[in-house]
Amino acid sequence: MIAQISEFRMPRYREIPDVGLYLDQTVKYMNRYLAPLGCMEITTSMVSNYVKKGVISHPVKKKYSREQLASLIYIVLSKNVLSLENIDALFQMQRAHCTAAEAYDYFCDEVENCLPYIFGASPVSYTHLRAHE
C-alpha cells in the first residue's frame, strides 16, 4: 500500500472531465481515483444525498460538471473529519476568495504532500517544532 501511496497523484482540476458525467459515470470516476487511498467507495445514493442537502449543486440535464466532481473529491476526503455543514461552509468561504480550480488544485497539492507522512512512507521531522521552544 505504501508503494501505491507514494505514487498516488490526484487529478488536477483541468484533468477532471469537462464533458458532464451521468451519476453512474461520476461514481465510477470517483471510486477509480480514490481507490489507492483505501477510502470507502462513494455510491450513487451518497452523491444524491449531497445534492439534496445542497452541499453540491444539482446536475444540469442529469450530468455532473468538473466543478461538482472536484467538490465530490473534496467531500469524500474530508467527511471523516468534517461535518457536511462544515464542508458546505468551507465551500462558501472558498467561493468568496478564489476559483474552484485554484482551491481544488491547492487541496490536491496539500493532500499529496501529507500522504507520505500519514502512511509512514516518510519520517516525520520535528525539527521545526524544536526551533520554537
List the model feature ranges, each with a label.
Residues 1-95:
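Basic helix-turn-helix/winged-helix DNA-binding cores
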Residues 100-120:
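Non-DNA-binding regulatory cores of transcription-related proteins
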Residues 127-133:
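Conserved small/polar residues in nucleotide/adenosyl-binding loops
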